[in-house]
Amino acid sequence: MTEIIDLDLVDDFIKKPMVKQQKNQSSKPRVKRRGQLTFDDFRNIKIVEEPVVLSHNSSIDESLDAATQNTKKREKYEGTCDEEMKTKEMEANMASKYSNIKTHSNDTNKVESISEHTTSNNRPLNTLNWSPNIPLRYSDFAKFMSDETVTESNWAPPLCTPLPYAGDVMKILSFIVKFKWVFSDDLLNLSFQDVEIGLELKVAGHSAKNIRICQDKMNLLFCSLLRLLFCSEKRADNQTHRNFTLKRFLSLKNPYGKLVGKLRSLIQEWGLPKEWRGNSDILSTLNFNGGGLLTMEPLDRIILLRCMIDWNCSYSALFHNEIQRLTHLKGDTGFNHQTFHASRFAMCGANNILDSCEVLCSLMSQKLENRKKRKPSDKGKLSKINSQMKFLKGVRKSLSEKVTTDRLRAAVKINEEWGEYFANEFTHTPIDDPTVDEIYKLRTSEFMIARIPRVGDFYLPPFWIGNECSSVNTSYSFNDMSTYLNYFVKFKEEGTKILPAKTAQNENKCQLKLIYRNTPACIRNLQFNDVHFAEVPHWFEVAGDSNSLSNFIEYLESLSSLTENDTDDTKKGIDNLIEFLKIFSIFINETIQRITAAPTGSTEGRHLRTSSQRRTTVHYSSDVNGDVSEESENEVDIDVSDDYDSEYLSEENTLTRKGEDRTDKSFGKRELHNGAKDCDRNCDDIEIFSEPVRQLQDNSREKRSLRRNARKGL
């Protein structure tokens, strides 16, 4: 064929003509570019079966493992040496030896997961839960959901009073604990009874002074949450909110300001709770004449505080930034699931902690032996491995003691030295304090002490011990790890049948709240029952003082003896709860003895403050939509009489042993003046001044002088 030479295509450097082919000349088939599919493309499609490795319930890593499992199975077993086989047998025997350390059927802390196919890298050592907390899973009660009678049929404690607001009260107390750096010291020692009395949910049997103090604290809590909710972005990182104390709150003329009106305008946008959806004007009377929470019904008060916590978590810049920080911490919780969790020593007992520590040391020593067999070239690494193995050898010898108290002392001592040898191996051990690391802070159930399958959950919120003259708030002292371990040693040394709380003096009261939640019935009603969830009680009080606590312990002992199977999870949960409550009884007895031996001072009662009777010395504004809360000392007119000063500060002076002369002085004044002066105290500013005077500005000099002259006339 004749070739056609195109002179325009000649290369300038080589001077060699290039051949240009004609259109009808044969060439290579053109490859189609990627684009829209045509019918020709569909003709080439072949139908194949779905591969096993691409199942919907497996992740990418699981699919890759399944694909390579068959190809590497023969190579894996052929390359296994005799020494590694011995290691596998030792780990399997160890798993059967310590198989009793699991608490629930679905707990991640199961040593039985060590199988015969464990490789030499000791993967189960990192997958098991060695943290001081254990997760609270739904699967703990899942197998009981098919039963109509979820709870044990013989579960009938001597005291089981329905307490529908218990969950909301513990939510408030838990929120204060998690974000205690923004609240004042007056709110950090709140107990369950303080919230219950301050919101008038239960006021029977309490003095007028105690009721009024609790009411002031609840108004302080509401005002603090209101200020934090509308905190600006500039002040989001400022920790000056702790300066908003109870004394400062009571001295302000209008502590709420425009914040209540702003809350009313946004509540429709944020959404109402289900209890208020039939009455959208529930907040119309809030802060009427400066009354705060006391202008609402008792049940509406607890609902409002619960909603304030939810709104702060969602819309407050201060709490939003803190939650963002706590949820993005570097570290591992140990169980790799974002769920609620509770402390191990309360839920499982000391024996579980000691067994877990022993298993951890055994597996860690085996891992170090495998490292040593690889003969590291660096002499520094070899010496480090030898020192670690020597330390673990002494640890295992100490934990092999038969006496539980000796094992516990050894475990505490070992935990102090653990970080020096294994700083990069594990971040947590079972004997650690569960409240130290911030990674557990956000989802910790602080007051939970037991979970019993087929029965439910048990909580011990903050309480106080004392009498009218002196009281000690034991809010969080017993839940401390070191405190619990010290009393556990005393309990083991003194005997297991000690119930000293019954022999305590009658004048020293222990007003605790042991709360029981029927969790199995709660889950079942949420899933299968058509009955309205709020109409069925799920929260109960099973102990309210020392005597009822002793009766409940005796009932649990009789209930535990009915179960013949010692391996049952229900029996294990009951035994752990009995042990915890007996140790708690020793703590109560020693605290009461310490209060009885301490000298007490005389204090005076205070008048009850209700929605219709408010003190004159705190100048609440009648204008709800007034100026924003005034906190400057030169702008606020603080006119506090000597009677009120001694009356309010009597509790603080008793605790600090100061101001006794002031208390005696006020007591003498009240003896001289009879009912005439007491009636005048109950008058408000609105009743004192006429309408033209009330129309003046609150900050005007003329109105302040008229106010002072009017009180002098009274």
Swiss-Prot record:
Chief location: cytoplasm
CC per GO annotation: cytoplasm; nucleus
Polar residues bias: start-end ranges: 610-624
List, as start-end ranges, the regions of compositional bias called Acidic residues: 628-650
Q: Which UniProt keywords apply?
A: Cytoplasm, Nucleus, Repressor, Transcription, Transcription regulation
* Compositionally biased residues, Basic residues: 704-714
- What's an example Gene Ontology biological process for this entry? heterochromatin formation
Disordered: annotated segments:
598-674, 694-714
Question: Where does this protein reside within or beyond the cell?
Answer: Cytoplasm; Nucleus
Give the compositionally biased regions (Basic and acidic residues).
Answer: 654-674
Q: Whom does it interact with, and what assembly results?
A: Interacts with GAL11 and SIR2.
Report the protein's function: Involved in HMR and telomere silencing via the recruitment or stabilizing of the SIR (silent information regulators) complex.
Q: What else is known?
A: Present with 432 molecules/cell in log phase SD medium.
Name listed for the protein in its UniProt record: Protein ESC8
What organism does the record attribute this protein to?
Saccharomyces cerevisiae (strain ATCC 204508 / S288c) (Baker's yeast)
Gene name per UniProt: ESC8
